[in-house]
Regions:
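Glycine/Thr-rich phosphate-binding loops of Rossmann-like dinucleotide-binding domains
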Residues: 41, 115-116, 156-157, 180, ...
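FAD-binding core/adjacent interface of flavoenzyme oxidoreductases
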Residues: 1-7, 62-147, 205, 223-239, ...
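Rossmann-like dinucleotide-binding cores of NAD(P)H-dependent redox enzymes
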Residues: 145, 153-210, 291-296
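Glycine-rich Rossmann-fold phosphate-binding loop(s) that bind the pyrophosphate
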Residues: 10-14, 36, 128, 149-154
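Short FAD-binding loop at a beta-strand-to-alpha-helix junction that anchors the flavin cofactor
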Residues: 250-266
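Mid-to-C-terminal Rossmann-like scaffold of FAD/NAD(P)H-dependent oxidoreductases
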Residues: 2-5, 262-346
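A short, polar/charged loop-to-alpha-helix boundary motif
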Residues: 345-360
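Beta1-alpha1 glycine-rich phosphate/pyrophosphate-binding loop at the start
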Residues: 2-74, 161-182
């Protein structure tokens, strides 16, 4: 590799934004993106919604057309797993093939789904990659019974999509309320009520004890820790993710940077911002002002937008009804430090601007 070359390990959003920003800011050295999946960078959020519903195809998920990568001299090395990083020799070592040398390295390796310590038969899925979504989509047939283990946003989106496709859906959550760790019990229970009103069987304070298989080895039921049994033709396990940190150096290395879910909160907007920040660090450019945390989710007729960083212990001020509401998380001085907004896009945009100019980001 020529001098000043940048290798980016991870072909997700953070890796793609790093490469794009390097070129946009005038970097003319070699850029290589190495991705473990055999596909170019794509929009992961659509996997649980439009792609699963069949309203978007794989080509429409691409972050950029193939001509973009070629036209900007960004090399994509896909279907390649990096096994080792040598920060001293400045090389990355793929499972097969020759090492790649780098002047600067960006680790954007993302996150992987947390696995349950159970033996899981056929018909049990996770959803992180395009391949996962392909496999799950083939099994979402009308009239079938889907059990979603985990009441997070992705699980709720899959439940919403499957319900619209005509499946019978149950959501199993071990906590007292879904997304309680982020939004608190009060708001989480509001969402659970919304799911129930739409016909979802919601089981709270119940974990997965066992997945039962039929004679063919395929799932036919799940047994919960509260003793109940749910029929299941398909199961989605969505109990969170964990960062893929195996390649991170044990000690800080001046030429090694990290971006995206491997170091961040695991959300689309944060990953994009991280990629931009990594590129600017490499180029020695000043950091951009911090942005308010932002997450969105489309489920059961609601566009949910989380602005800022809510704390479950914060007092919550509610306004609106089941179809359009704002839950404001208040600081000690009574000001809004974060909010969950449902079908309130203009207010969400205004709050993002408001928090951008407040002291909340400094205190978060």
């Amino acid at each position: 590799m020529n001098a000043h070359g940048v290798v980016i390990v991870g072909a997700g959003l953070a890796g793609a934004r790093t490469a794009e920003t390097l070129r946009a800011e005038g970097f003319d050295g070699r850029i290589v993106i190495v991705g473990e999946e055999p596909v170019a960078p794509y929009e992961r959020p659509a996997l649980s919604k439009e792609f699963l519903a069949g309203t978007r195809d794989e080509e429409s998920l691409q972050l950029r057309k193939p001509s973009f990568w070629d036209g900007h001299a960004i090399e994509l090395v896909l279907g390649t797993r990096i096994e080792r990083v040598d920060p001293v020799a400045r090389t990355v070592h793929p499972a097969h093939g020759q090492p790649l040398e780098f002047d600067q390295l960006v680790l954007a390796t993302g996150a992987r789904p947390r696995r349950l310590p159970l033996e899981l038969p056929a018909g049990v899925h996770e959803l992180r990659t395009l391949a996962d979504a392909r496999n799950l989509r083939t099994e979402l047939t009308p009239g079938s019974h889907l059990v979603v283990v985990g009441g997070g946003f992705v699980g709720a989106e899959v439940a919403s999509t499957a319900h619209a496709l005509g499946l019978h859906v149950a959501i199993v959550e071990a906590a007292p309320a879904p997304v309680a760790r982020v939004l608190g019990d009060e708001v989480g229970l509001m969402l659970a009520d919304r799911w129930r009103a739409r016909g979802i069987d919601v089981r709270l304070r119940a974990g997965l004890a066992h997945v039962r298989a039929d004679a063919s080895g395929r799932v036919d039921a799940v047994l919960l820790t509260d003793g109940s049994v749910l029929r299941a033709d398909v199961v989605l396990v969505g109990v969170g993710v964990e960062p893929v940190r195996e390649l991170m150096p044990e000690r800080p290395a001046i030429a090694v940077h990290a971006a995206g879910d491997v170091v961040g909160p695991g959300h689309w907007t944060a990953a994009a911002q991280d990629g931009v920040a990594a590129a600017r660090r490499i180029l020695g450019l000043p950091s951009l002002p911090p942005q308010p945390h932002y997450v969105w989710s489309d489920q059961f007729g609601l566009r949910l937008q989380v602005v800022g960083s809510p704390r479950p212990s914060d007092p919550v001020e509610l306004d609106g009804d089941a179809d359009s509401f704002v839950a404001r998380y208040l600081g000690s001085d009574g000001s809004t430090r974060a909010a969950l907004l449902a079908n309130r896009p203009l207010e969400a945009a205004a709050l993002r601007r408001e928090l951008q100019t407040s002291d909340v980001l400094l205190a978060a």
